Amino acid sequence: MNSKIIEKLEYNRIIKQLSDLAITVPAKEQALTLMPSSNFDEVKKSIDQTRVLSNVLRVKGPMPITDFKDVRASLKRLKVKANLNGEELGNIFLILSLAKDVSQFTADLEEREIDTRPIEKTLKNLAIPEDLFKKLNQAIEYDGTVKDTASSKLMQLRHDIQSNETDIKNHMNDYISGKHTQYLSENIVTIRDGRYVLPVKQEYKNKFGGVVHDQSASGQTLFVEPQAVLVLNNRQQNLMAQERQEIHRILIELSELAGMYQKEIKNNADALTQLDFLSAKSKLAKAMKATEPVLNQDHVIKLRKARHPLIDPKKVVPNNIELGTSFDTMLITGPNTGGKTITLKTLGLLQLMAQAGLFITAEEGSQLTVFNEIYADIGDEQSIEQSLSTFSSHMDQIIKIMKDVTEDDLVLIDELGAGTDPEEGASLAIAILDDLRGAQAKIAITTHYPELKLYGYNRARTTNASMEFDLKKLAPTYRLRIGIPGQSNAFAIAHQLGMNEVVVDKARSLMNDEDSDINKMIERLTEQTKAAEQLHETLKQNVDQSITLKRQLQNGLDWYNQQVQKQLEKAQEKADEMLAKKRQKADKIINDLEEQRRAGGQVRTNKVIEAKGALNKLERENQNLAQNKVLQREKRRHDVSVGDTVKVLSYGQQGVITKKLADHEFEVQIGILKVKVTDRDVEKISTQAAPKKAERAVRSSRDLRSTRASSELDLRGQRYEEALTNLDRYIDSSLLAGLNTVTIIHGIGTGAIRNGVQQYLKRNRHVKSYSYAPANQGGTGATIVYLQ
């Protein structure tokens, strides 16, 4: 891409924002050098990677990456077998630690249904050489400080240094707190040349013996190392020298080990840089409220509610921009200061952002393509000077475009033909457009020449467009109107400003009939288009609301079905457990009787009667279990298949099995909704019984809706378990009824039910928020719940 074009479209400001959002220096540098690509596969891959990190940011938050230094210089030194210093090794340890953290952070992405294939190679590079990591972790801090645990010798040396230093300080403290204080300039201990000394008055320098290391500027104070601590200080220096030697040995050992893993270190550093860079892309998308562009290879642009990313979101006016659908050339006509130039810049900048793998500031589903080149001749419509020099520069740029343009390019020209005689300028603009269209490029131009309005109607795959003007406010709205040419509003503006109506009417009469008819036609077309757009927007909002409601209902039904299924499974397990216990009791009775018989003893009559009574009781209990609804459902579980009409027991409604999802799991169509159920939760309806069951299902549905209609649930006077069960059912019903706000009345009492209610609400993913009711509506005796 031409650097001048990138500068004109202010792409550099975008990548500066991107760089600011990166954490590591290498990622910041990568952001500042990011250029749009003209390779479709590269662009798609880049967009896919941005999508992955945007999903990660949304689901898990930012990557656990902190800043680290560029490791390339250290790797060069390792390559020639040079030793690294502590800071360099600490930086490598930091890189490996971050890689380990990020690897753990991304381990469950697939479980969270995030497709990581676009960054799979990058994630695989997060491979930690465990022996190097273990050694560095034992030996060094991130800032390069060598740890005591680096070696047993170093640990002992540092212990000895600390102990010896304590002895020195104790001796010195005796000097500054005892009878020797009269000989000191100050009662302090200081250090000179790495040795502990006392500030002694010049006349008492021989009182302490030892060595004079320094003196004050006046010569009145001498810094003396007393004879009593001279040996200790010498030992301290010796220990510290040994410490330095041991640290040097450790750094050599660590450098040699790091040299064995140069490739792994580079791979981890590169992977972290790439993930930081992609994370910056996702953060930029979030900050701009940008969306993923849908890429196509048909050179089609279809932007919905596109916003210029560098204009204040509170002030910018979003526009729909199209090219390559039913037209390849768009002529935006009309007066200056209406937003024509910004429209061109928005189109060009969003196209550059997409080709750089960035999300765009437009509505979801907006389409963009990948151009080989983007040509732009754009000035500032607020300050264009119609001069010969401007015209020459303008023509020079256009001539270069005409020489190089192809069908794979996008051409953006602001004020085509401006800067010369209007008649000649219009003719020249038409000829230039014909030439550019001959190359089959995608073209968007702005012009104030009225002659080009007819061009937009007369040429194939060419359309007019204009910027809307509010005649009541006498101000531009900055909305783009595709298909409607710009019109002069001079008469309307003059009339609005109070010009004599006679003068305005005379001015209108001086226009030729053809121009007058065209203006009237444009006015009618503008009104009709505006009405159609308003209707379309209303219908779109209604459709969006319906889709959202359907999704909420579907999610609510699925969740409710899961809860019911869990209860059914618990009941089944309990029934199975009860049956097993009864069988064990029966077996024990029989075994006891058999043992007595085998022992040769006579079984007493009362024992036989007791055994028979126990067996009869078990038989009755087993019959009750056999009649248990849960067990009956269990027996019916294998009796359904695709196409069967069934009753979904958890909903009390009738539906048709449309798909078998897995063993014992089916998809059932209930009206407009599809729900996932298990075969335990369905009952096959025979053909003869279907009408009757359907009637019951309708009645059940109506009854259910009736219960859902209530926006209050009163739990006062209920037991704790009963209250929470009723609360669970009520929330489910409220979700299915589409209620957004409900009130739970739990009373004050001991607070047990109130606490139970709020614990339940805290765990429920369909509860957006909750709070106590206002004082006049129950206060702490009621909780208002907001559902989502």
Curated annotation (Swiss-Prot):
InterPro entries reported in the protein's UniProt record: DNA_mismatch_repair_MutS_C, DNA_mismatch_repair_MutS_core, DNA_mismatch_repair_MutS_sf, MSSS, MutS, MutS2, P-loop_NTPase, Smr_dom
Record SMART domains: MUTSac (SM00534), MUTSd (SM00533), SMR (SM00463)
GO process terms (BP): mismatch repair; negative regulation of DNA recombination; rescue of stalled ribosome
Disulfide bonds: none
Residues the entry annotates as binding ATP: G334, P335, N336, T337, G338, G339, K340, T341
Iron in keyword set: no
EC number: 3.1.-.-, 3.6.4.-
Transmembrane domains' residue ranges: none
Classification via PROSITE patterns: SMR
Gene Ontology terms, MF aspect: ATP binding; ATP hydrolysis activity; ATP-dependent DNA damage sensor activity; endonuclease activity; mismatched DNA binding; ribosomal large subunit binding; rRNA binding
Claim: DNA-binding is one of the keywords in the record: yes
Keywords linked to the UniProt accession: ATP-binding, DNA-binding, Endonuclease, Hydrolase, Nuclease, Nucleotide-binding, RNA-binding, rRNA-binding
Domain of life: Bacteria
All residue ranges annotated as the Smr domain in the record: 713-788
Described purpose of this protein according to its UniProt entry: Endonuclease that is involved in the suppression of homologous recombination and thus may have a key role in the control of bacterial genetic diversity.
Quaternary data: Homodimer. Binds to stalled ribosomes, contacting rRNA.
Family: Belongs to the DNA mismatch repair MutS family. MutS2 subfamily.
Protein name, per record: Endonuclease MutS2
UniProt source species: Lactobacillus johnsonii (strain CNCM I-12250 / La1 / NCC 533)
